[in-house]
Structure formats: C-alpha cells, structure tokens
C-alpha cells in the first residue's frame, strides 16, 4: 500500500484544553509521521476561504466564528492509507456518535467545537495542505 498524506487541524477548543501533546502522541502511536505543522490564528477571510464549500449553509457563520476564536494547529500526517486511518482515529464528526477512544469522543465539546478536523479524501487533503503549507514547508520522513 502506498504512503499517503492527510491534513489535520487541532481546533481552538482542543488547543485551549492544552491537549496538543496528547493528540500528537496518539497520532504517533497510531503510526503517523508528522511531516509538517504550524500554529496560527485564522483570520475571518482565511476561515471563510478554507470552509468555502460550506458557505450558505446554516452553520457556516458559527463555524467561521469558532475557527477564528483562538489558535489552531495545522498538520500534515503521513502513513499508509492516511486519510481513512486518520478519520477513524478522529471518530464521527458529531461527538455524540463518536466511538469511545476516538479523539472526538475524548476532546470534543459539541458538533461545531469537535476538537479536530481531518481531510475526507486524498483530493481534499491535497487542497487543504496547499491552503496552509507552501513549497518546502512539508518535510517527508524517510526513516
């Protein structure tokens, strides 16, 4: 199976809970290599651009407000079948439906404040990585 890259966000509520290290430890324990990461505070324009596919939906303004409410940590993860394995680790988008032991079951506060984001396809991962990371900011792990 080929090595894939996926995109991950630790959202403002999880950053505020000071669980970044715990989440990274779980990524690594699951076999992911962290090949790019940065902390930033999204502007309204960045949040609206990143979530543009949801523009016009009832939850869009609340999502933008939440995602600009504090710092986030964006990361690129690498492993075999990375997109699906990462989504499995995150758990259901709605934390009420997330299985015990998933990140959302452990760190989410609500459907909007669900602690984490993960790409839903390889195409989304490529687009989302390019949104936040420029040339040379992702370092492949070869060991």
UniProtKB/Swiss-Prot annotation:
InterPro entries: NDK-like_dom, NDK-like_dom_sf, Nucleoside_diP_kinase, Nucleoside_diP_kinase_AS. The keyword Magnesium applies. Gene3D superfamilies: Nucleoside diphosphate kinase-like domain. Its EC number is 2.7.4.6. Pathway: Purine metabolism. Keywords: ATP-binding, Cytoplasm, Kinase, Magnesium, Metal-binding, Nucleotide metabolism, Nucleotide-binding, Phosphoprotein, Transferase. GO terms for molecular function: ATP binding; metal ion binding; nucleoside diphosphate kinase activity. This is Nucleoside diphosphate kinase. It comes from Salmonella choleraesuis (strain SC-B67).
């Amino acid at each position: 199976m080929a090595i894939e890259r996926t995109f991950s966000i630790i959202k403002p509520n999880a950053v505020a809970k000071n669980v970044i290290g715990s989440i990274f430890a779980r990524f690594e324990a699951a076999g992911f290599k962290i090949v790019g990461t940065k902390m930033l505070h999204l502007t309204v324009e960045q949040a609206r651009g990143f979530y543009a596919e949801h523009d016009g939906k009832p939850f869009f303004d609340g999502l933008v407000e939440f995602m600009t409410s504090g710092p986030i940590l964006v990361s690129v993860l690498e492993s075999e079948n990375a997109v699906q394995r990462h989504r499995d680790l995150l758990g259901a988008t709605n934390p009420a439906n997330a299985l015990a032991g998933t990140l959302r079951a452990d760190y989410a506060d609500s459907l909007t404040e669900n602690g984490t984001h993960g790409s839903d396809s390889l195409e989304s991962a490529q687009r989302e990585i390019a949104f936040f990371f420029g040339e040379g900011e992702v370092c492949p792990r070869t060991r």
